[in-house]
């Protein structure tokens, strides 16, 4: 989609606006959506997240990051022939929510279910890294919502799950948990 916009339109996107985070649940284990780590010991150079006890939920949390972008898109005049009901000009706001949770991303190749390795250890930095599953949700605000939001849905951008581990950078687990706990204690 980004390639099509680059070829057939000019656009501008603002810096992030109204960035908020949300971490539900309780760290002490009294809530359903809580932070926890698998009780099994992680052994450097032995398991790398491939053990059976890492497959379903080696960690669990619920963490949303919400951002807003001001967006302006103007289609080239010659695209009127094939753009159908999509307006030639749109200015509005995208509300984007990135939802992270402890589900291990998985998908099927034929009859095989595939899960990327979830953990790695950087010896030099002494960091335990993990790749979080996350879902991106986009909703538009502005004119022509009866066209724009269904268009996002048709393109599967209203609820987009990042399946490929290369699309998500690994996070340092200790840094993440320190941030999540400190943010909750405020």
UniProtKB/Swiss-Prot annotation:
UniProt family annotation: Belongs to the MG032/MG096/MG288 family.
Top-level taxonomic group: Bacteria
Protein name: Uncharacterized protein MPN_041
């Amino acid at each position: 989609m980004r390639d099509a916009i680059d070829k057939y339109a000019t656009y501008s996107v603002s810096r992030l606006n109204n960035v908020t985070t949300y971490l539900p649940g309780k760290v002490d284990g009294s809530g359903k959506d809580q932070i926890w780590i698998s009780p099994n010991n992680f052994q450097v150079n032995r398991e790398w997240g491939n053990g059976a006890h890492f497959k379903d939920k080696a960690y669990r949390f619920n963490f949303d990051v919400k951002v807003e972008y001001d967006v302006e898109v103007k289609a080239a005049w010659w695209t009127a022939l094939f753009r159908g009901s999509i307006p030639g000009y749109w200015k509005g706001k995208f509300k984007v929510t990135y939802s992270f949770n402890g589900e291990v991303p998985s998908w099927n190749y034929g009859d095989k279910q595939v899960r990327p390795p979830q953990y790695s250890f950087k010896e030099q930095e002494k960091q335990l890294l993990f790749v979080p599953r996350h879902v991106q949700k986009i909703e538009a605000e502005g004119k022509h919502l009866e066209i724009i939001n269904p268009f996002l849905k048709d393109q599967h951008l209203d609820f987009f799950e990042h399946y490929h581990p290369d699309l998500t950078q690994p996070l340092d687990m200790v840094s993440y948990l320190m941030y999540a706990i400190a943010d909750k204690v405020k």
